[in-house]
Amino acid sequence: MVDVNDVIHANEKAQIDFAQMLLPEGIRRDNNKMYEEVEIPPNEPMPIGFEEKAVFVSELDEIGQLVFKGMKRLNRIQSIVFETAYNTNENLLICAPTGAGKTNIAMLTILHEIRQHLQPGGVIRKDQFKIVYVAPMKALAAEMTNYFSKRLEPLGIAVKELTGDMQLTKGEILRTQMLVTTPEKWDVVTRKSVGDVALSQVVRLLILDEVHLLHEDRGPVLESLVARTLRQVESTQSMIRILGLSATLPNYLDVATFLHVNPFIGLFYFDSRFRPVPLGQSFVGIKTTNKVQQLHDMEEVCYEKVLKQIKAGHQVMVFVHARNSTVRTAMSLIEMAKNRGELSFFQVDQGADYGQCEKQIQRSRNKQMREMFPDGFGIHHAGMLRQDRSLMESMFSRGYLKVLVCTATLAWGVNLPAHAVIIKGTNIYDAKRGTLVDLGILDVMQIFGRAGRPQFDKYGEGTIITTHDKLSHYLTLLTQQNPIESQFQQSLADNLNAEIALGTVTNVDEAVRWLSYTYLYVRMRANPLAYGINHKAYQMDPQLELYRKELVVESGRKLDKARMIRFDERTGYFASTDLGRTASHFYIKYNTIESFNELFNAQNTEADVLSIVSKAEEFEQIKVRVQEEDADGKSSVQILCGSHHTNAARIMRALFEMALRKRWPAMTYRLLNLCKVMDKRLWGWAHPLRQFNTLPASALARMEDKNLTIDKLRDMGKDEIGHMLHHVNIGLKVKQCVHQIPAILLESSIQPITRTVLRVRLSITPDFRWNDQVHGSVGEPWWLWVEDPINDHIYHSEYFLLQKKQVVSGEPQQVVFTIPIFEPMPSQYYIRAVSDRWLGSEAVCIINFQHLILPERHPPHTELLDLQPLPITALGNREYESLYKFTHYNPIQTQIFHTLYHTDTNVLLGAPTGSGKTIAAEMAIFRVFNMYPTSKVVYIAPLKALVRERIEDWKIRIEEKLGRKVVELTGDNTPDMRAIAQADLIVTTPEKWDGVSRSWQNRSYVQKVAILIIDEIHLLGEDRGPVLEVIVSRTNFISSHTSKTVRVVGLSTALANARDLADWLGIGQVGLFNFRPSVRPVPLEVHIQGFPGQHYCPRMATMNKPVFQAIRTHSPAKPVLIFVSSRRQTRLTALDLIAFLATEDDPKQWLHQDEREMTDIIATIRESNLKLTLAFGIGMHHAGLHERDRKTVEELFVNCKIQVLIATSTLAWGVNFPAHLVIVKGTEYYDGKTRRYVDYPITDVLQMMGRAGRPQFDDQGKAVILVHDIKKDFYKKFLYEPFPVESSLLSVLSDHLNAEIAAGTVTSKQDAMDYITWTYFFRRLVMNPSYYNLDDISHETINKYLSNLVERSLRDLECSYCMEIQQDEQTIEPLTYGRISSYYYLKHQTIRMFKERLKPELPVHELLAILSLPCSDYGTDTKTVLDNAIRICQAMLDVVANEGWLVSALSLCNLVQMIIQARWLHDSSLLTLPHIQKQELYVFRRWSSRGVRAGCGHQGPIEGLPELIAACDGKEDIFTSMVKEVLQPNQISQ
């Protein structure tokens, strides 16, 4: 075990142990009773080397000259470094004294980076890079931002400050090329996980100023930054150059190793001889130990030193360490000078504008300043007013002050040199440790850096006055004899947590590897004793693997105890928790989280919360002044919090997230309000209009006195408001502000899905006026949660953004989510929406459960009987048996065999994916072949891909081997009537069969159907469900008319409400088989992981590492299928996985094929990204791939040549190749119609999971589902218990009614009512009335509900010119447009749009505009558009013909031809030939018949197809000779 604290103390001891001290030559020592002084004279400057030559600005290229304008040449150090900094991409470490011009070296590297993105013509590609400059203090960051902004302005490079004081929006960051930030801020930014356009991904140059800070308390932040950057460079394989700038340090080689600097190229070390103004140093140690005497002696020595400089005619700065000491020291120096009669030395000669200065001083409110000025003394500290500080700076630089007494802030923030500086005393109070500590070496160096003014002085002088016991400490430090050590162990736990939350460290081994990138590791190997590692241990473990592991495990245990991570010591895996992520994102320390865990609970009041916040470790630096006489600093924090503190706002946000995650509604609400109180610096009880700074305070005070709430003000007129406030003109302004406070209206509706789950649809309508100056230009963020007031629990919460455009247009935003409900039923829940930024801006909506009717309980599943497996010989037909490769049916098939093969009853089979339902369908097909050989079988599959799969299989097995005709009927493939009439088996999609069977009276083959097999019938509940519903209803309707029964077989996954579906299909006890989800042939193990984050893309990016981990854990060598939502995600996921593989020992571990063979295959692939991923054994599969690429990928995966396949969700349905492990990466997809991310139907997720487990190879399958954390509970519930199927017919009822009216089956309103009673919708309406917005199920109510429904649908159709109601108000007459709509399978709204937009004489381009309207969502998917375009054009043609418009009709005929031939009307007809593009047409134009044997039909150049046909005269060799130079042989043969 390692105790970190012991190590830290050992570390400190080892650092101060200086037995042998080497001092430079020429020093002078003075030892008397009062003090000992060591004086080091200034160094001689370094002689100029033989090869050194100065670099002149005029020699630089154009960009360099622009930036260094006004400078003649670079100084000595800059010239030495120039070549490496300006012309290479090497990492650099520059150690040089303060004031040596390191900032310009940084500028050289910046210019090198900019030049790499310079395009011909002088354009800089600004979006391709970011430069980050990390400065140690905010004051310095501001100074650097100004400096770089001015210098880079000619190049148009934007420089912005990003610190705690200066926040930037996402847009500002994107528009900025250079960010100047502090270590802590950049740490926070890079801790947030990387999104798509992640900031850290485009950083190309990282500049770290003052790297010697590694020694200080803030060193660990720098270490974690560099480690994170270096690991990112390795994992993404993209270069980030690192430049370290530091003061001269002894162990510069260690720092160079840590920054990965090549010591022979990128390491430059300049000692004090390179200072622009040499520095003389003197160290004074006061001998007495009596504290009072010590102070007195220090002042005495200080006075002597000051007087000596003043007599020599120099100005002096005296640095002290507390604000009140500045005045005290100045007064005592004046006092001494008076007593000794030497005050005249300090007083300034009164020059010309002295009087002016005196006036300025006298105007100041600072009494001490006014009193001291005449004596030539000034003071300066951060507690003074800005103008007073500036006044002191200008007086000192103009020479009107001889002595300036100041604190160290002057040395850091302001560039104000003096000939001599004196540091009086080196004890400063450190609030964290609660004691006095030594002044940090960094401050000393910075202060000494102010000694000597470059233009005026030959040398500068720095004096440090300390106690005698500290004398040697400062001597060693300032003569650079102490190596700088790492402080990383102090905050190892916090930094480890940040890496785990980011996902870059997931187990102990990775954490050990991560530590090897830190400075701690470099120093532990160089100086093991200082870190508590003895000689023997170091010899046994020279790489310190074991020691690093001990450190990691101990930190892991600490974090696990604080519930910030879950640490499984057996496997060594780390998993981040919500608490750990919150701590990392809000930069909260481990100790603070521990105290929160102890103190924070749901019952805390506001006062308790403030008290908890004030106990945070972040506030230790707040000290209580003696005058305040309060022993406890914590109450001081509370008071300061009340007046505002940056840390408090951050910690408050973290507490808010914790409360939200713990699901405490009252606490969440309270904390969100406190967060806003901190941000706005307004108490919650103040009037909300105080958030506007445009209204006068008097008016606001009156509103508070008269209790004029926002609601009251909304209802009042502007004049009334003016009178109430005794200020007539202000009414309008107040009214405008009232309407700009964000307000929303909430409306909710609920649908019970089961007895325990409700779906809530929430409509959010903005109710305020947008003003860019008040609201910005993006949107207003809100928090939304559903709370149960009785149990004090949040059942659902989410963050949403009201976009500016939604507010301006007033369009409502729809949010859909599910919540649990418990019995006994509560009376109500509340939906609460609270603005994230505005006080007093919230809305509440009540969900009332009084009229809620929950659906019936579901009957039990079918038990799987313990039967002897049935051999396939039971089919009794040799031909059928020969189709199967197995000998016996599986248990499910055995149990259903008799019903399917020996009876004609309707069957509903509910069984998990992968249990052999297709073979069950074949049993029913064979029954028809046996019993009704002249009838037809129709097999309906929901997707074209499924139809294709069945066709490919059955064309061989049923058509070739059994001699039965199999026909495909889809949008892609419409055979002629004769083929359909002769077919025995028709495989089709729901829409196509619906379109065909609509006119069943005229199509004899529809009446010959003996069996309808519907695959995936549970899709009834999805968007395309209504079509299935209509098909079955129509089939029943047809068989009732033709008195010939049609058998219906439904295949589905396990269902919750199978009984309802069975009743509707007319199935009694015999035909219903609904097995449990658990009776899969291969058992399935499911893991569900939740991921936080409101935004989709960054959330997907955070899932990539867990995907990689899951593959390594569950399926290191077996096939893996990863499902994602879009083509883009297939690419991003694949590229990230390759990046993770790159860090492994064997990056091609997923490729199970000889690399040379794979190279040959890759050569045939068209898609560039796929070429890259296949080389690593990762395939991609989506609709955008070329057919041949897709086939290649499928073959490689099925034959286990590649191990991982990343596919879009359609593959789950379309292709049957299972894998050992299935990963569902995210359960939402982008829905173009509603323009937002919506959830996959649960059936899709089950289908994807169903692909896990290969029946012949695996004894169990694995599925890993990665979801948005707020949906985790929902998926937990429904992935294990089946999901009930509801009807979706309501939304599209009008279109289906129209089809029946056009077909003549519905001729009156009563027929329409009867038609509805045939549907599944009618069954479910009675079973789950609340789902369909029906309040009760009495006969009367249902009748009324249905007649309203019919009336509404018919009215819609009438408005669309599809039908008309006769005068008796009952009879319905179809119109031409209704028939067109039905025949071409178009929505009635589309036909209405055609009727209103088509005109007599429309040219083609306007027709295209009309055609594109219904398909605007398919901007990218040309294929989807083309599937529908011809059908829609033909419908338009019918509409135009019906109106008798010839010009438009001809235009449409041209348009259809253009679409089918894929060319414009005026293009050459030769383009209809495959593979011929415009650029290849020249081969035809230049052809002539000379040289070809006589008798050729065409002589000259060929312009079109008829000429080509004549020229070739049916001879292939003539055609080949024409095109052989532009086409490959295989292309010619096509």
UniProtKB/Swiss-Prot annotation:
Reaction it catalyzes: Couples ATP hydrolysis with the unwinding of duplex DNA by translocating in the 3'-5' direction; ATP + H2O = ADP + phosphate + H(+)
Chief location category: nucleus
Example of a GO MF term: RNA helicase activity
Top EC class of this enzyme: isomerase
PROSITE patterns with a match to the protein in the record: HELICASE_ATP_BIND_1 (PS51192), HELICASE_CTER (PS51194)
Residue span of motif DEIH box: 1015-1018
UniProt xrefs under InterPro entries: AAA+_ATPase, C2_domain_sf, DEAD/DEAH_box_helicase_dom, Hel308_SKI2-like, Helicase_ATP-bd, Helicase_C-like, P-loop_NTPase, Sec63-dom
One cellular-component annotation, GO: nuclear speck
Alphabetized UniProt keyword annotations: ATP-binding, Cytoplasm, DNA damage, DNA repair, Helicase, Hydrolase, Isomerase, Nucleotide-binding, Nucleus, Repeat
All copies of domain Helicase ATP-binding, residue ranges: 83-267, 898-1073
Coiled coil: none
Gene3D superfamilies: 5' to 3' exonuclease, C-terminal subdomain, C2 domain, P-loop containing nucleotide triphosphate hydrolases, Sec63 N-terminal domain-like domain, Winged helix-like DNA-binding domain superfamily/Winged helix DNA-binding domain
EC number: 5.6.2.4
Ranges where the Helicase C-terminal domain occurs: 294-500, 1106-1313
Subcellular location: Nucleus; Nucleus speckle; Cytoplasm, Cytosol
SEC63 domain residues: 576-849, 1374-1481
Protein name: Activating signal cointegrator 1 complex subunit 3
Gene from which the chain derives: ascc3
